[in-house]
């Protein structure tokens, strides 16, 4: 060991001495004595490794308390951090999909703070059913006879098939064998549910007679799957639920539908593309309809199944139902969200998903122009900051070909180097409240459709 190495080792402080320093008192109060000591030991090991490798001390050895504070502060951050979503995708799966209404947030907080009547009937002091209150709401909204709630729509489809078609065949059009994110495929779900898939028709055209010819003594269901995350256009043919229900009645085979996104209101009244609604399919005679709670409905992650009472009863009594049931927080948020639909005149104001989807391009353009000046003053030395028209998307597999006119702030490096865009995007991801945009066509785009808190946005970007 050289004299220089010995000298560097001698500069490393003893843990006891560091802990006696006044700057460590607050750290010990905040993070606990055990964790602070554990980290100091780790840092001493790191420092010794640096000395052995490069014959120098780490820069942070000049202020141990500051480095400990920085590391423990970062460590204490939640893995689920709030972000500002300016990607242009409203229901961004990776960012948690639907924002919850204030009523839903309050309902969840109340359900977490105290015991609730989850499975308790106040009328006779007996055991109740956890889905009952929501089932009544869903029946009122959709016109269904009964309803069942599980933890997501994939679970809803699995339960629906396992409880009504295990060991039997399910007839589905070839053009509706969808795959959603995470390689969730309808054929795979059928296998897990113990069903046999019977494909009919072709990718682009399926006729009523295709279903008729497929039905046999082992057929349990005729199934429709709404292709909410892709669109087949051109020379196409598909039969709707009403026609399939008529065929099912003739052949004595129930019809079920996986709607996926599942809007409970006619979106066209807000200037958005229309999506099929559960209540329309119930009115057409479909026996079971499944859809998501956290997409166009604007609530928490949940799988909702509405339909005929005798079919729902089979789902409720199946062993999978207990494994897939929703917890009290989900049920509280979903109930509060569904109650908003009882007052449709205020829905676009109180439901964040609908509020963001219905923001006009003109309003967003004015907002972008208002924010452009301070950002150009701050970033103008390196980037040209401009207001540009753009197209937002709904996201989460909803209305895949439809786009919403919007406006964005774009950042273009004066030297044209793409690495500067990557660096800027990385800097924004490290902010206390990360700002998430997207890089496209030599620019960093911040689509402002989902920006409601301008003050927080500017506080982050002008740091």
From Swiss-Prot:
Name of the protein in question: L-seryl-tRNA(Sec) selenium transferase
Pathway(s) the chain acts in: Aminoacyl-tRNA biosynthesis; selenocysteinyl-tRNA(Sec) biosynthesis; selenocysteinyl-tRNA(Sec) from L-seryl-tRNA(Sec) (bacterial route): step 1/1
Subcellular location: Cytoplasm
Species of origin: Escherichia coli (strain K12 / MC4100 / BW2952)
EC identifiers of the protein: 2.9.1.1
GO aspect biological process, one term: conversion of seryl-tRNAsec to selenocys-tRNAsec
One GO location term (cellular component): cytoplasm
Gene3D superfamilies the record matches: 3.90.1150.180, Type I PLP-dependent aspartate aminotransferase-like (Major domain)
GO MF, one example: L-seryl-tRNA(Sec) selenium transferase activity
Enzyme class, first EC level, given as a word: transferase
Modification sites for N6-(pyridoxal phosphate)lysine: 295
Necessary cofactors: pyridoxal 5'-phosphate
Alphabetically ordered keywords of this record: Cytoplasm, Protein biosynthesis, Pyridoxal phosphate, Selenium, Transferase
């Amino acid at each position: 060991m050289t004299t220089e190495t010995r000298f560097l080792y001698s500069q490393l402080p003893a843990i006891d001495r560091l802990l006696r320093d006044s700057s460590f008192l607050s750290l010990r109060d905040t993070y606990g004595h055990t964790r602070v000591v554990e980290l100091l030991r780790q840092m001493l090991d790191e420092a010794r490794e640096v000395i052995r490798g490069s014959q120098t001390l780490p820069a942070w050895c000049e202020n141990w308390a500051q480095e400990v504070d920085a590391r423990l502060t970062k460590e204490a951050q939640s893995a689920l951090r709030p972000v500002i979503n300016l990607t242009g995708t409203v229901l961004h799966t990776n960012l948690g999909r639907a924002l919850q209404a204030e009523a839903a947030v309050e309902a969840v907080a109340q359900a977490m703070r105290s015991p609730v009547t989850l499975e308790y009937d106040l009328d006779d002091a007996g055991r109740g059913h956890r889905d009952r209150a929501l089932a009544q709401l869903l029946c009122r909204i959709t016109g269904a006879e009964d309803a069942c709630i599980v933890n997501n729509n994939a679970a809803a489809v699995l339960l629906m098939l396992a409880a009504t078609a295990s060991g039997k065949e399910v007839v589905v059009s070839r053009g509706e064998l969808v795959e959603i994110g995470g390689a969730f495929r309808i054929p795979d779900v059928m296998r897990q549910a113990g069903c046999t898939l019977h494909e009919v028709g072709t990718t682009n055209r399926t006729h009523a007679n295709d279903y008729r010819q497929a039905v046999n003594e082992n057929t349990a269901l005729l199934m429709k799957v709404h292709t909410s995350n892709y669109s087949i256009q051109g020379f196409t043919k598909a039969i709707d639920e009403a026609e399939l229900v008529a065929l099912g009645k003739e052949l004595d085979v129930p019809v079920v539908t996986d709607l996926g996104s599942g809007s409970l209101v006619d979106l066209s009244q807000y200037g958005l593309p229309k999506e099929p609604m559960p209540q329309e399919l119930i009115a057409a005679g479909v026996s079971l309809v499944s859809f998501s709670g956290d997409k166009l409905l604007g609530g928490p992650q949940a799988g909702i199944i509405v339909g005929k009472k005798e079919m729902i009863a089979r789902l409720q009594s199946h062993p999978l139902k207990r494994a897939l049931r929703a917890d009290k927080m989900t049920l509280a948020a979903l109930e509060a969200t569904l109650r908003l639909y009882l007052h449709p005149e205020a829905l676009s104001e109180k439901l964040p998903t609908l509020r963001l989807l219905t923001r006009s391009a003109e309003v967003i353009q004015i907002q972008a122009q208002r924010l452009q000046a301070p950002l150009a003053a701050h970033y103008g030395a390196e980037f040209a900051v401009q207001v540009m028209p753009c197209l937002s998307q709904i996201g989460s597999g909803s209305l895949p070909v439809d786009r919403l006119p919007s406006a964005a702030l774009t950042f273009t490096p004066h030297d044209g180097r793409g690495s500067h865009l990557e660096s800027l995007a990385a800097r924004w991801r490290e902010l206390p409240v990360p700002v998430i945009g997207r890089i496209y066509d030599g620019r960093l785009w911040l689509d402002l459709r989902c920006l409601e808190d301008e003050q927080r946005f500017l506080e982050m970007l002008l740091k």
